[in-house]
Amino acid sequence: MIKIGAHMPISKGFDRVPQDTVNIGGNAYQIFPHNARSWSAKLPSDDITTKFKREMKKYGIDWENAFCHSGYLINLASPKEDIWQKSVELLKKEVEICRKLGIRYLNIHPGSHLGAGEKEGTERIVRGLNEVLNSTEDVVILLENVSQKGGNIGYKLDQLKKIRDLVDQKDRVAITYDTCHGFDSGYDITKKEGVEALLNEIETLFGLERLKMIHLNDSKYPLGAAKDRHERIGSGFIGEEGFAVFFSFKEIQKVPWILETPGGNEEHAEDIKKVFEIIEKFDIEVD
């Protein structure tokens, strides 16, 4: 069974997310644990978490298919000490929110070194992750491959491996693969040999069991453009035929697919429908 959903709004409360997910045709989702553009975050009340967990059960969403995404302001690679420290403290709070909600996975962008260099940026990311992981429990941090722009660290998978290799609690660090970011950085998933190479690289660097989520996004720009502009499924340079190749791999089908395509719930419902149309159109076998 395909596990699919979208990044969902929390404006109506955490407890609305499971129902809204099912309403758009999903059985998986991603949310922000707080206002993504704020340094402020607070733990949800016991009443809120009780309602949320009840709705998760009511709508039959598996906890392995529930994800949080860290806020936009966090930058663990920042050479600015005040920003780095605020990032560490906010990430700790996000982990605590996830743990209270019962969500096991928290996705993060590793960060941008802002010109200080990849080596220094990587060291700061590792130091920050160690501080967060050593002061929290249970929640697994997912390192996402990012776009190849600015001082971003993590646009190549071996950069994510360097981070994970240096972290103390490796069992609490796994990865997310974003199809737009990868395409943007030169990973061509529109061809069978490209997907095979990607899967082989993930297996070699991390083990495929460490791939916990796929951000399913088309790309507004061509392969290797380093622009980072998500597009609706089938409407970008990956396209229907490209996604058909990607979807045909059993290893890909085992991982939850989360849409971060332009638009809201209505557009995401259409994109989920489009995914299944591609599967049917290209006669893709699904377990």
From Swiss-Prot:
Record's cofactor remark: Binds 3 Zn(2+) ions.
Keywords for the protein's UniProt record, in alphabetical order: DNA damage, DNA repair, Endonuclease, Hydrolase, Metal-binding, Nuclease, Zinc
Residues that bind Zn(2+) 1: 69, 109, 144
Annotated GO biological process: base-excision repair
Binding site for Zn(2+) 2: 144, 178, 215, 260
Record carries keyword Transmembrane helix: no
Cofactors that this protein relies on: Zn(2+)
SUPFAM superfamilies, per database record: Xylose isomerase-like (SSF51658)
Residues noted as binding Zn(2+) 3 in the record, renumbered to the chain: 181, 228, 230
Keyword Mitochondrion: no
Domain of life: Bacteria
Protein name: Probable endonuclease 4
Classification lineage: Bacteria, Thermotogati, Thermotogota, Thermotogae, Thermotogales
Gene of this entry: nfo
